[in-house]
Amino acid sequence: MLRLLRSSWARGLGSGVATWRPSAGLFRPGCPGIRQASGASDTPHHQSPSSESPVQPVGVGVCSMMRLPLQSSPEGLDAAFIGVPLDTGTSNRPGARFGPCRIREESLMLGAVNPSTGALPFQSLRVADLGNVNVNLYNLQDSCLLIREAYQNVLAAGCIPLTLGGDQTITYPILQAVAKEHGPVGLVHVGAHTNTTDKPREEKVYHRTPFRRSVDEGLLDSKRVVQIGIRGSSRTLDPYRYSRSQGFRVVLAEDCWMKSLVPLMAEVRQQMGGKPLYISFAIDALDPAYAPGTGTPEIAGLTPSQALEIIRGCQGLNVVGCDLVEVSPPYDLSGNTALLAANLLFEMLCALPKVTTV
C-alpha cells in the first residue's frame, strides 16, 4: 500500500501550519507551501472540490490537482493524478521537475464538467490526487525503479494513473508498470520528437530514449503506436527510420498544419481497437507560441485546438494510463504552458473509459 511521505505544510506567510503525521513511502505531498483544507480526508469524492466550493478563491485550500482530495492510497479509486518531479533525464533546458507543482496551481481554476464533450468525470469516477512519486534526483536509474514500483501498486489497485511530469524519461518506467498489468499496449504519443534514439554517449535511459527502450522490452504493441506532431532538425535520421521500421505510424507536424485532426483520429481509433491504450503527451508538441515553457522547443508545432482534437479523439477507447510531460516552469513566465497542461490532463480524464456524457 502506498503512503504519502507527509510533512508540515504552511498556508502562507503569517498563517498557522497544518501538520501531517510523518510516514515513509513512495509518495509525498504534491505542492508544498499550501495548507490542507479543513475536512479533507482519504475518502475519495465523485465530485471535484472545485465545484463543491464555487465561491472559494483561487489559491485557498488544498494545492492538489483541481482541488481534489489528497489520498495516501490508490485503493478504491478509479483514476488518480500523480506527479513525477524528475528532470535529470533532460538533454537541453532543465526545470521539468517543477512541472507537477505548477500544473496543480493552474488547475485550480478548472471546473468539474466538460461542456464541449458533455463529459461528467467526477460523477462517473472516484478520483483523487496521490501527490508526487518520491524520486531520487541524484540517481536517474534509482528514480526509474521508484517510479515503476509506485505505478505497479497504483495499477494493481485498478486505478488509472494520470501523470504530471517531469521529463519524458518517466514514461519508460510507467510503461514498464502498465505492460506488467495489461501486457503490451498501444500508444498515442504526441510530441515534437520520436524519443526513439538509441544510446547517445552510451546512455540508454534519458528523455530521448523511452520508446526505444519500451520496444526493446516488449512493452508496446508496435502495430498500434502513433506518433503525432514530430518535427525539427535532427543529428541523424535514425530515430525516424527506427520508428517506422517498428511499424509506428509517424505523423509529421507538417502533415497537421492548417487542418482539423478529427479525420486522423478516426483512423487512429480504428487502429487502436478495443485493446489497452496509453496516451503520452509532451507539451513540446505544441508550437512554442502557445507553450514556450518546455525544455526542447521546436518551431511550427501543433495548436491547442488540435491537441484537444487528439485527446477527445481517444474518448471511448480502452485508455489505461496517460501522462503530460516536459513542462518547464522556469521558461513559462506567463503560466500559459502549465495552464494548457492542466486543461489537457482534464481532457484526458474526460476521455477515460466509464466516463458518462450528457
From Swiss-Prot:
<dbReference type="GO" id="GO:0005739">
    <property type="term" value="C:mitochondrion"/>
</dbReference>
<keyword id="KW-0007">Acetylation</keyword>
<dbReference type="InterPro" id="IPR005925">
    <property type="entry name" value="Agmatinase-rel"/>
</dbReference>
<comment type="function">
    <text>Hydrolyzes linear guanidino acids to form urea and the corresponding amines. Displays specificity for substrates having a negatively charged head group and short chains including taurocyamine, guanidino propanoic and butanoic acids. May protect cells by detoxifying potentially harmful amounts of guanidino acids. Metabolizes L-arginine with low efficiency.</text>
</comment>
<comment type="pathway">
    <text>Nitrogen metabolism; urea cycle; L-ornithine and urea from L-arginine: step 1/1.</text>
</comment>
<feature type="region of interest" description="Disordered">
    <location>
        <begin position="31"/>
        <end position="56"/>
    </location>
</feature>
<dbReference type="GO" id="GO:0008783">
    <property type="term" value="F:agmatinase activity"/>
</dbReference>
<keyword id="KW-0809">Transit peptide</keyword>
<protein>
    <recommendedName>
        <fullName>Guanidino acid hydrolase, mitochondrial</fullName>
        <ecNumber>3.5.3.-</ecNumber>
        <ecNumber>3.5.3.1</ecNumber>
        <ecNumber>3.5.3.7</ecNumber>
        <ecNumber>3.5.3.17</ecNumber>
    </recommendedName>
</protein>
<comment type="similarity">
    <text>Belongs to the arginase family. Agmatinase subfamily.</text>
</comment>
<feature type="modified residue" description="N6-acetyllysine">
    <location>
        <position position="199"/>
    </location>
</feature>
<feature type="binding site">
    <location>
        <position position="168"/>
    </location>
    <ligand>
        <name>Mn(2+) 1</name>
    </ligand>
</feature>
<dbReference type="GO" id="GO:0046872">
    <property type="term" value="F:metal ion binding"/>
</dbReference>
<keyword id="KW-0496">Mitochondrion</keyword>
<keyword id="KW-0479">Metal-binding</keyword>
<feature type="binding site">
    <location>
        <position position="193"/>
    </location>
    <ligand>
        <name>Mn(2+) 2</name>
    </ligand>
</feature>
<dbReference type="GO" id="GO:0047971">
    <property type="term" value="F:guanidinobutyrase activity"/>
</dbReference>
<keyword id="KW-0464">Manganese</keyword>
<dbReference type="GO" id="GO:0006525">
    <property type="term" value="P:arginine metabolic process"/>
</dbReference>
<feature type="transit peptide" description="Mitochondrion">
    <location>
        <begin position="1"/>
        <end position="36"/>
    </location>
</feature>
<dbReference type="GO" id="GO:0047972">
    <property type="term" value="F:guanidinopropionase activity"/>
</dbReference>
<dbReference type="InterPro" id="IPR023696">
    <property type="entry name" value="Ureohydrolase_dom_sf"/>
</dbReference>
<keyword id="KW-0056">Arginine metabolism</keyword>
<feature type="compositionally biased region" description="Low complexity">
    <location>
        <begin position="46"/>
        <end position="56"/>
    </location>
</feature>
<feature type="modified residue" description="N6-succinyllysine; alternate">
    <location>
        <position position="223"/>
    </location>
</feature>
<dbReference type="GO" id="GO:0000050">
    <property type="term" value="P:urea cycle"/>
</dbReference>
<dbReference type="GO" id="GO:0004053">
    <property type="term" value="F:arginase activity"/>
</dbReference>
<feature type="modified residue" description="N6-acetyllysine; alternate">
    <location>
        <position position="223"/>
    </location>
</feature>
<keyword id="KW-0378">Hydrolase</keyword>
<feature type="binding site">
    <location>
        <position position="284"/>
    </location>
    <ligand>
        <name>Mn(2+) 2</name>
    </ligand>
</feature>
<dbReference type="Pfam" id="PF00491">
    <property type="entry name" value="Arginase"/>
</dbReference>
<dbReference type="InterPro" id="IPR006035">
    <property type="entry name" value="Ureohydrolase"/>
</dbReference>
